[in-house]
Amino acid sequence: MAKRLYGLFAILFLLCGLSACSKPETALPAQTTVLILGDSLTQGVGASSAQTSYPALLKQQTQWNIINGGVSGNTSTQALARLPELLQQHQPTLVIISIGGNDFLQRLPNSDTQANIAQSIALSQQSGAQVLLVAVPELTLAAAVGHPNDHAMYADLAQIQQVHLLEDAWSDVLGDEALRADPVHANDTGYQVFTESLTKRLQQIGWLD
């Protein structure tokens, strides 16, 4: 009997390790400062107004102090360059990182993109913030007519650096013509769908009640 229980605990421990499971995080109260580092998808390109961008929608749902750090056209290099000042100015409790799409569109080396995102995670953690990494699909002209998939580097980064990951949210939105303003940007409905995926993940993690 003891051996069977030991074996069961061993299996559960292994599964936790493989899935990066951990004790649920503490819920973040209203007015918590949350920085979202990103590109045009975070800025809200394709939305009918700034109020229908996903950072604005997230603020409405959480009452957090959301800092929209999205700049259209930014690559991971450019976002990384902006990050230290953003961290110093806003001192966020949580940093959400959603970057890489422009790197893929410009065919920049994946190794550089991964290194930049890894450094963005490290800088955020060094500032005392927790991190949520958002997986981004490898956008190509071929993907625009099919269903894009998350680039594998995001799962690798989340595992290596032990941060929480939101998977498939952008891929699902950009893979549905009804949710897109154009092949690489969401429309109002798409940003709403993405926000729903994001808030669900935040609840799973424990940051949002």
List the predicted regions and their residue ranges.
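Serine-esterase "nucleophile elbow" of acetyl-processing enzymes
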Residues: 21-75, 82-91
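Sec-dependent bacterial lipoprotein signal peptides
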Residues: 1-19
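Alpha-helical cap/lid subdomain in secreted, periplasmic
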Residues: 59-61, 81-209
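N-terminal processing/targeting junctions
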Residues: 14-18, 24, 200
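Conserved Rossmann-like nucleotide-binding pocket used by diverse enzymes
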Residues: 17, 67, 132
